[in-house]
Each structure stands twice: as C-alpha cells, then as structure tokens.
A protein has these predicted regions:
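Ubiquitin-like/PB1-type beta-grasp interaction modules and other compact soluble beta-rich domains
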Residues: 2-4, 8-32, 37-236
C-alpha cells in the first residue's frame, strides 16, 4: 500500500484591521448655517432675558424696601395710643431711637437735608403737630424732628439713607399702624393718608419721605379741601 504524502499547511492569512471610514466632511448648507445662528440667537436671548428679570426683581425689591424693618409701634416705649392731641413724648425719646434705626446727633446732618409738611385732621379740625419733636432737652436731636408747630418735618442726616413715615411717628411717639393712628382705628373711625392731595394706597408706615411732600392724615369726617401742596419758606 502506497504511503500517503503529508500536506504542508498553508501559512496563515493576514487579517487587516477594520479601517475607520473617512468620508469627506460635507460643507454646511446656507440653511444649516441659518438654523445654527437662529439657535444661538434664541439661546442668547433667553440668557439675557433671565438676567434682566433677575436685575428687575433686585432693583424693584430694593426700591420698595422700607428704610428699616418697621417695628411694631405698640412696642415702642412711651407710644401714645389715645386720641389727639399728642405731645412730643420727649421723656421717652431715647428709648425709641434704636428700634427705629435712628441716632442721637449733636448736630444736624447735611448729607440728607429735606423737608415735608404734615397736616392731621380729626373730623375736619386741624391737629397741632408739636414743636421740638425729636429734640431732646438740648442734649441731642435725631435725624427726624420739628423746630416749630407749623407741621414742617425736618429730615437731616449725616449719611445718605432713606427715611419713612413710621420713623417720624416713632420719634413723635404716636402709634401708626396700617389700621390705627394714635387712638383712631379704622374698624371704628375711618381715616386715610394723602400725599400731595392723592390718596395713598400702601402701608402708611412705609411711605418714603421725599422733598416737599404734602402729607395729610384725615381722620373721620374730612375737611372741605384736602391739602395738595404747601408753600415752604425760602431756604427749605
């Protein structure tokens, strides 16, 4: 029997690694570019709008913020909660300054130096705003005060800041809340606050004091005419 020839195995074939397909990059069409620019534009517009909204809320809240956190006037020492007339309540003035955010000054401030006029009517009759409100026995005066009984309010501060009606009434030592002035509360005696002859709709305590305002508090039956302006003396 013939001997079978052994076959030499064929050498292994080289296996080529898969090649990454490299198609030439298709240039963007004008429509593609236009869509891309529009998408970027919308994104930027959204970012800008969000920034403006945040800025508006910050500025709005800051501009409407009260000069200080308004204290409960009933908690102020020596506050008068009875009917008019009301005195200047000077004996207890030092104890009211800190909760009102005010200071005992040796001189009138000049950084803020503005004036307002205050009228108060009870059933058509004018109530006197006392002289020397906020001036303590010649020892000190505070940023908000009066020099006479004309109703002129003096706001004189050594630092730039805002002041409100709550602070003036706190210095005066007369209760002022959203519903009560002194002993007059809206549940029993209606009253309204007017600024330059127009009814004020907000919290009366938060009214910011500005130059040459005519402020009128009308309790009960109003006078024939609500004052809308006041003729300040020269220099005020």
């Amino acid at each position: 029997m013939a001997k079978k020839k052994s076959r030499t195995p064929a050498p292994p074939r080289k296996v080529q690694a898969p090649q990454r397909r490299t198609d030439p990059k298709r240039p963007r069409s004008p429509e593609d570019r236009r869509f891309l620019f529009m998408a970027i534009g919308f994104a930027l517009t959204g970012v800008i709008a969000l920034g403006v909204a945040v800025l508006f809320l910050f500025v709005f809240n800051d501009s409407n913020k009260a000069a200080v956190d308004i204290p409960n006037s009933d908690s102020l020492v020596g506050v008068q909660t009875g009917p008019a007339p009301w005195n200047a309540a000077l004996d207890t003035l030092p104890g009211r300054l800190e909760p009102l955010g005010l200071n005992a000054l040796t001189n009138e401030g000049e950084v803020v130096h503005i004036h307002q006029h205050l009228d108060i009517y009870v059933n058509g009759k004018k109530v006197t705003v006392p002289s020397q409100i906020g001036i303590y026995d010649g020892q000190f005066l505070t940023e908000l005060h009066t020099h006479d009984a004309s109703g002129i309010m003096h706001v004189e501060s050594p630092t730039k800041r805002k002041f409100d009606l709550a602070q003036f009434f706190g210095v005066w030592g007369v209760r002022l809340t959203p519903s009560c002035v002194g002993g007059y509360c809206k549940e029993l005696t209606p009253w309204r606050l007017y600024v330059d002859g127009k009814a004020y709709q907000g919290d009366p305590r938060a009214l910011e004091l500005k130059p040459h305002q005519e402020i009128a508090i009308v309790i009960g039956t109003p006078p024939k005419t609500i004052p809308s302006k006041y003729k300040f003396p020269p220099g005020l």
